[in-house]
């Protein structure tokens, strides 16, 4: 995949860049693996805003992705590489030898016609190779391997490293835990029985995309972000004042929580004991 720069025929297109979508082999999704997506606009079941600055955007179909990779021991052929509007990564449509179809995240190097497999074949004991797109428990993955779509709890499905271009590295194994270096720099313990997929998530040039205009953000369902100092005092702790005031206090959230450098993580959180090195720590 490469990034295409547009001709500056307008102010909005002057700095705009788009993907060339050269890896895409089909435009329409597999109908049996799609469901309608109801827009929530950042509201919860009571209709109250729980995620600000969400709403609008283009209508989408949700593609059902296999994050668990629990169909073990059966080979699958990559039928197509497709675009998914619900995520930054591309997705691959797999045709299993028993006739089932599933979507997975498309890693770097996976192309149409490749064969992938998960886990171990129960009939002949064959283990999936260390190749992009193959999924294995981390106890069977060599130290130093680049992985993505990593489970935090066995059987729950991949939760880490699912965005375009992301990956973690398996740096060590200690007893029942594997040590992973995550994209943030954090080193974390995960059970070796958790499943991960070999390789780096594809569409690595996504970070080079420049939207170029506000309208492209609106297409994605992102609404404008209003500064606290531009609000009224009823709406924000920094609001109000005569003329262009600075807010009169250190930057805070709309609920008064310090916004710059204040640690918000619960010190008693159980998973803290699994974090060997925090992100940003030298």
From Swiss-Prot:
Transmembrane segments: none annotated. GO terms for biological process: cytoplasmic translation. Residues 265-282 have a biased composition (Basic residues). GO terms for molecular function: rRNA binding; structural constituent of ribosome; transferase activity. The keyword GTP-binding does not apply. SMART domains: Ribosomal_L2, Ribosomal_L2_C. Residues 230-282 are annotated as: Disordered. InterPro entries: NA-bd_OB-fold, Rib_uL2_dom2, Ribosomal_uL2, Ribosomal_uL2_bac/org-type, Ribosomal_uL2_C, Ribosomal_uL2_CS, Ribosomal_uL2_dom3, Ribosomal_uL2_RNA-bd_dom. GO terms for cellular component: large ribosomal subunit. It comes from the Bacteria. One of the primary rRNA binding proteins. Required for association of the 30S and 50S subunits to form the 70S ribosome, for tRNA binding and peptide bond formation. It has been suggested to have peptidyltransferase activity; this is somewhat controversial. Makes several contacts with the 16S rRNA in the 70S ribosome. PANTHER family: LARGE RIBOSOMAL SUBUNIT PROTEIN UL2M, RIBOSOMAL PROTEIN L2. This is Large ribosomal subunit protein uL2. It comes from Desulfovibrio desulfuricans (strain ATCC 27774 / DSM 6949 / MB). The gene is rplB.
């Amino acid at each position: 995949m490469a990034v295409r720069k547009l001709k500056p025929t307008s102010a909005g297109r002057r700095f705009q860049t788009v993907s060339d979508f050269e890896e895409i082999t089909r435009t329409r999704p597999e109908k049996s693996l799609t469901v309608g997506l109801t827009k929530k606009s950042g509201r919860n079941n009571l209709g109250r805003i729980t995620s600000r600055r969400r709403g609008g955007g283009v209508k989408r179909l949700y593609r059902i992705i296999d994050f668990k990779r629990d169909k073990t021991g059966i080979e699958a052929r990559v039928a197509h590489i497709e675009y998914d509007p619900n995520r930054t990564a591309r997705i691959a449509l797999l045709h299993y030898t028993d006739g089932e179809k599933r979507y997975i995240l498309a890693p770097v190097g996976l192309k149409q016609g490749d064969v992938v497999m998960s886990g171990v074949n129960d009939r002949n004991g064959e283990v999936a190779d260390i190749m992009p797109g193959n999924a294995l428990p981390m106890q069977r993955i060599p130290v130093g391997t680049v992985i993505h779509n990593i489970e935090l709890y066995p059987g729950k499905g991949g939760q880490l490293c699912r965005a375009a271009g992301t990956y973690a590295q398996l740096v060590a194994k200690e007893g029942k835990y594997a040590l992973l270096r995550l994209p943030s720099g954090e080193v974390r313990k995960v059970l070796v029985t958790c499943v991960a997929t070999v390789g780096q998530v594809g569409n690595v040039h996504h970070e080079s995309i420049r939207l170029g205009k506000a309208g492209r953000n609106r297409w994605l369902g992102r609404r404008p972000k209003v500064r606290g100092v531009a609000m009224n005092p009823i709406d924000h702790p920094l609001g109000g004042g005569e003329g262009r005031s600075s807010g009169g206090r250190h930057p805070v959230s709309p609920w008064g929580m310090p916004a710059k450098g204040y640690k918000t993580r619960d010190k008693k959180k159980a998973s803290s004991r699994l974090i060997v090195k925090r992100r940003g720590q030298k």
